[in-house]
Design a protein with these regions (language model features):
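Short, flexible, solvent-exposed loop/turn segments with mixed acidic/basic and small polar residues
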Residues: 7, 35-36, 139-142, 193, ...
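Structural motif of enzymes handling amino- and sulfur-group chemistry
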Residues: 158, 166-167, 174-224, 237-239, ...
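Conserved PLP-enzyme active-site core in the AAT-like
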Residues: 1-189, 224, 307
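Short Gly/Ser/Thr- and Asp/Glu-enriched loop/turn motifs at secondary-structure junctions
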Residues: 145-148, 252, 283-289
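Flexible, glycine/charged-enriched surface loops at secondary-structure junctions
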Residues: 100-101, 141, 171-177, 192-199, ...
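Short glycine/threonine-rich loop-to-helix capping motif typified by GTGT followed
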Residues: 117-119, 210-211, 245-250, 295-301
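PLP-dependent enzyme catalytic core of the Aspartate aminotransferase-like
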Residues: 259-315
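Conserved PLP-binding catalytic core of the aspartate aminotransferase-like
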Residues: 204, 209-213, 217, 226-272
């Protein structure tokens, strides 16, 4: 998505000012910062408002003869709460139309799914951005979308044609394997209500707690059947966090299995599991090696059992 944002800015607003709220100057992993990407694109950052409150007149008062873009950035990896105010995309689109300035929204993680239908926190969808009238929308092909890492750009034909003709487009284009993986993912969105389980990210986010608990009990039973008196197995209530720069406030109730082995530290267990032929990633809490069953597939339970069994035999 950083590439998509850069390409849009370089095409639309190079040498011109881009108006953006101070509360939306995001940084994600790898030190990707909106101001830095904007500077590299040749665009000129024009900050408005404050960290927690930005109003419509902040944008309008900042418009000058050399304003090239109104930019709205979804804070997909953090949330500003409390005494806050922001300007909706619809309001920015109306302002852009009044002064004939294009409006771009960077959704960051991006999603086609209304997660509130599944009892999760609402995230703005790509469809909503398009319906609101944004001239250009950028978002990630991975993260909440569930496909390969890629930057996505959708929008109005005139701007997309300019973007496609930019020589930098060829330098940033994805390879054919990534394109094939992306197409395969997007095809599933044609019937997403039926296909949601076929996209691992979405399946894990929407997995019912009862199903997770059943898996946790099954894994605990498999581990107990190893029959090593040194190992204790505990069922644990957990909270899953999506991560990946998305849904920062969401905590999903989940179930986990905690492992403790006499004479072997939790750090050693974690290292051994991570070094397995198929790496097994857990976390450590209170000297327990813990696995969240939300992210473990049904056919992976035996892999975990065999890895622990082999570790115990060598210890």
């Amino acid at each position: 998505n950083a590439g998509a944002v850069f390409l849009c800015l370089e095409t639309i607003s190079r040498g011109k000012k881009v108006i953006v709220s101070r509360g939306e100057l995001v940084e994600i992993g790898g030190s990707f910062r909106i101001p830095d990407v904007m500077a590299k694109s040749g665009s000129i950052l024009k900050e408005v408002g404050t960290t927690n409150r930005t109003h419509f007149n902040d944008y309008e008062n900042a418009i000058e003869h050399d304003t090239g873009l109104l930019l709205k950035v979804h804070t997909s990896n953090y949330s500003v709460v409390g005494f806050t105010a922001d300007v909706s995309l619809e309001e920015l689109v109306a302002l852009g139309a009044k002064y004939q300035i294009p409006v771009m929204e960077d959704l960051g993680s991006g999603t086609f799914v209304d997660f509130s239908k599944y009892g999760l926190l609402k995230e703005p969808t790509v469809q909503e951005s398009v319906a609101a009238g944004a001239d250009v929308v950028t978002f990630s092909g991975d993260k909440l979308l569930g496909g390969p890492q890629a930057g996505m750009i959708i929008g109005k034909n005139d701007l997309l044609e300019r973007i496609k003709k930019n020589p930098i487009t060829r330098a940033l284009r994805i390879d054919k394997l990534t394109l094939a993986a992306l197409e395969s993912t997007l095809r599933r969105y044609r019937n997403i209500d039926r296909e949601i389980d076929s996209i691992p990210t979405l399946r894990m986010l929407t997995l019912p707690l009862a199903h997770i608990e059943t898996k946790a009990k099954e894994l605990a039973k498999k581990l107990e059947n190893i029959g090593d008196a040194r190992m204790s197995v505990t069922l644990i209530d957990l909270s899953s966090r999506p991560g990946g720069g998305a849904l920062p406030l969401l905590k999903l109730p989940s179930k986990g299995v905690g492992i403790k082995v006499q004479g072997i530290s939790a750090n050693t267990i974690e290292k051994q599991m991570r070094s397995n032929e198929l790496p097994i990633i857990g976390r450590i809490e209170e000297d327990l090696f813990i696995m969240d069953l939300r992210t473990i597939l049904d056919d992976e339970l035996s892999i975990i059992k065999n890895a622990l069994d082999n570790m115990l035999k060598k210890a």
